[in-house]
C-alpha cells in the first residue's frame, strides 16, 4: 500500500511538471505570434464626423464628446422631400455630461477644503 501511494505521488509530481512545461512553451509561442501580429497591424481608424455635420454617408462615424458618442439623427426638413442626417447629442446625454462636469468641479472644491 505504501508503494502504491509513493508511485501515485511520484506520478502526480511528474505529470504536473510536464504539463507546466508544455503550458510555458505554448505561452511563449503565443506571445511571439501576438508580437509579430501587432508589428504588422496597420491603423484603420477613419476620421469622425463632427457634431451637426452631415453623416448620411456613414451613420456610425459620429465623433465622441467627453463621455458619450454622438448619434446620427435623420429627419425630413419642413417642406422638403430629402432626408437630412446630422450628428447630434441626445438631450439626456447632454444633461448627464453637465452633471458629471459639475460633480468633478464640486469634488475639486472639496479636495481643496479638506485636502
Swiss-Prot record:
Principal localisation: secreted
Disulfide cross-links: 48-63, 55-72, 62-87, 74-85
InterPro entries registered for this protein in UniProt: Spider_toxin_CSTX_knottin, Spider_toxin_CSTX_Knottin_CS
Domain of life, source organism: Eukaryota
Any single Gene Ontology cellular-component annotation: extracellular region
Tissue: Expressed by the venom gland.
UniProt keyword annotations, A-Z: Disulfide bond, Secreted, Signal, Toxin
One function term, GO molecular function aspect: toxin activity
Residues of the signal peptide: 1-22
Pro-peptide region(s): 23-44
Compartments, record wording: Secreted
Domain notes: The presence of a 'disulfide through disulfide knot' structurally defines this protein as a knottin.
Sequence similarity: Belongs to the neurotoxin 19 (CSTX) family. 01 subfamily.
Protein's UniProt name: Toxin-like structure LSTX-D1
Amino acid at each position: 500500500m505504501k508503494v502504491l501511494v509513493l508511485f501515485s505521488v511520484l506520478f502526480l509530481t511528474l505529470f504536473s511538471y510536464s504539463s507546466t512545461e508544455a503550458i510555458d512553451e505554448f505561452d511563449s509561442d503565443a506571445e511571439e505570434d501576438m508580437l509579430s501580429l501587432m508589428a504588422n497591424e496597420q491603423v484603420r481608424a477613419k476620421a469622425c464626423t463632427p457634431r451637426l455635420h452631415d453623416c448620411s454617408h456613414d451613420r456610425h462615424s459620429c465623433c465622441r464628446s467627453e463621455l458619450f458618442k454622438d448619434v446620427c439623427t435623420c429627419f425630413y426638413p419642413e417642406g422638403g422631400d430629402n432626408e437630412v442626417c446630422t450628428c447630434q447629442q441626445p438631450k439626456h446625454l447632454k444633461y448627464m455630461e453637465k452633471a458629471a462636469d459639475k460633480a468633478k468641479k464640486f469634488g475639486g472644491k472639496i479636495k481643496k477644503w479638506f485636502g
